[in-house]
From Swiss-Prot:
Post-translational modification: Palmitoylated on Cys-243; which may be required for membrane targeting.
Positions in the Extracellular compartment: 187-220, 275-287, 346-359, 380-386
Gene that specifies this protein: Kcna1
Protein name: Potassium voltage-gated channel subfamily A member 1
Location of the motif Selectivity filter: 372-377
Intervals of motif PDZ-binding: 493-495
Amino acid sequence: MTVMSGENADEASAAPGHPQDGSYPRQADHDDHECCERVVINISGLRFETQLKTLAQFPNTLLGNPKKRMRYFDPLRNEYFFDRNRPSFDAILYYYQSGGRLRRPVNVPLDMFSEEIKFYELGEEAMEKFREDEGFIKEEERPLPEKEYQRQVWLLFEYPESSGPARVIAIVSVMVILISIVIFCLETLPELKDDKDFTGTIHRIDNTTVIYTSNIFTDPFFIVETLCIIWFSFELVVRFFACPSKTDFFKNIMNFIDIVAIIPYFITLGTEIAEQEGNQKGEQATSLAILRVIRLVRVFRIFKLSRHSKGLQILGQTLKASMRELGLLIFFLFIGVILFSSAVYFAEAEEAESHFSSIPDAFWWAVVSMTTVGYGDMYPVTIGGKIVGSLCAIAGVLTIALPVPVIVSNFNYFYHRETEGEEQAQLLHVSSPNLASDSDLSRRSSSTISKSEYMEIEEDMNNSIAHYRQANIRTGNCTATDQNCVNKSKLLTDV
């Protein structure tokens, strides 16, 4: 190895074998110098050799920045030593050689290779490309409010795992949702059901009919429902004013479900008040039909649990990622229903006791047969109809089985991504900086070696520099174009 300081470069150029006539421009000398410079990298005993210009393509990385890699230099062996994973470095070095292409070796686990990417500081862009190649779905960024109190409120209501009070609020919210769903179901029991078509009781006193009309505001179910709606409204309003973006707030499907969950209550309340004030019996039947439809919307409150349930979130993400496969499944079922309903109709057309009066009437039979449900309310009686029914069931099994592996694969991906430990969580939320400041480097250096050890290494390196410079000058085996220069900001080695 030949090592020399930048301040002695002119002296070395005067030695035998170094041109002095100026026939070679300095720029050309510098280019040849850069071309011939090589560096040895030792990865746990396995030595790699490459050119410095290859590493210099990415100056913000650990190997591409001379200051960053300086603390790993071994002056006695004239190489950089890293006690890291060997198989991973093949891909790391190829990243420099290929100009930015990163491929994980098949024998290196995903989390281990991610740690190597972070150690060599390849940057967030390289990590994102790596995750994309590995099949990771890019997660949406979730910005936080800028104001401190607004951020605290947002974390309190939006992220239950952020603090203890946030968990308490999440538990209260889940309990209120469950109570609301239980009330929605219990009020339909015959023993507790209040007939909305006639909300009153008749008593006869001295040949006089007295009608006592029940008041909805005294109904226990309505009172409990009101308390639940108060909590839902409070939670929605607080999260709206604390959210970082009002536009993104309304784009979130969960917030849309929250709004839909409370609208039926206010519509029902307004309708009841209008009926009591107007007392128009002619419009009562119409309003009751509308109210029944509106009350049905309350069942969507069960989806509010997905805000606090990882399982429901995984299911939703799986369905969202599998929309193409689900669309193909529905399309195949649609084709099968048309084909087999038509076939069974014509196969049973001559049968007097046929259950299939028309092709649309046979749609139901085709659907339940292809999904292998088979209610038995409609069935073929002829031999031809039974053959069609058998083919319909077989085709249904094959049709449903085709997209299932893709959907299961998506579910496994989202499930493992949500349930794996902190190590995988760091992989999915990695944010490695592109640049490291000198203060960070000094802190990391101090944590690696002590000051006395560093001074000893520096002294040995200076002695090595002087030794190799004198040896090369005496032998005259090196020229100015293949000399290695060492100064305060740059360390170059030649092997």
